[in-house]
């Protein structure tokens, strides 16, 4: 017998996402805005702003529309950047155990800016993700080299997010 996760799953999303959902799902989602924190089942979810800084990219992600997230449980803090650039809110994060940081042009940030941001908040581990852009894959080996060369204690973990990629 299968458990019905649909009826018990807690879903949080920014209002822009909720507005795009079909009514049956829309009514099940709790809105969460930038800088808000929600708690459920021993978890704490904090919405971190995500947005573009470069003038040519501001059309993709405006400040206040979307979220990255810090999820915390039992003293473990995990950050998901969402589609963002090297913004002050990311640089100012503290005590992050695992970070998932994007880098794909033109929608998010360059490899160099992603590395600079990670170096600023120095998570224990960082996973480059969401790095396939319009012109192929971002150079995650370069990202790893830049972070490894910094004087911080951050382990870069490379996962095969695109196993069927032809590149």
Regions found by a protein language model. Name each.
Residues 1-13, 95-100:
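Active-site metal-binding motif and surrounding structural segment of the metallo-beta-lactamase
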Residues 3, 19-25, 39-40, 91-94:
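Short loop/helix-cap segments at secondary-structure boundaries that form the rim of catalytic
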Residues 7-16, 125-130:
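Short internal beta-strands
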Residues 13-20, 33-35:
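Short, polar loop motifs at secondary-structure junctions
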Residues 25-37, 41, 115, 119, ...:
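Binuclear metal-ion centers of metallo-dependent hydrolases, dominated by the metallo-beta-lactamase
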Residues 32-94, 161-167:
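Core dinuclear metal-dependent hydrolase active-site scaffold
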Residues 45, 83, 99, 126, ...:
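Divalent metal-coordination and catalytic microenvironments
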Residues 70-121, 129-137:
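Metallo-beta-lactamase
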């Amino acid at each position: 017998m299968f458990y019905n996760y649909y009826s018990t799953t807690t879903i949080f999303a920014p209002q822009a996402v909720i507005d795009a959902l079909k009514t049956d799902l829309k009514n099940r989602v709790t809105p969460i805005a930038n800088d808000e924190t929600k708690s459920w089942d021993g978890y704490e979810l904090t919405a971190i702003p995500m947005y573009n800084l470069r003038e040519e990219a501001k059309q993709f992600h405006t400040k206040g529309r979307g979220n990255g997230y810090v999820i915390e449980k039992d003293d473990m803090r995990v950050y998901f950047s969402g589609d963002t650039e090297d913004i002050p809110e990311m640089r100012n994060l503290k005590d992050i155990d695992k970070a998932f940081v994007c880098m794909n042009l033109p929608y998010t940030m360059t490899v160099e800016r992603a590395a600079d941001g990670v170096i600023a908040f120095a998570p224990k581990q960082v996973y480059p993700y969401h790095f396939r852009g319009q012109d192929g894959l971002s150079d995650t080996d370069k990202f790893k080299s830049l972070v490894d060369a910094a004087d911080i204690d951050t382990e870069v973990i490379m996962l095969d997010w695109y196993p069927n990629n032809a590149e």
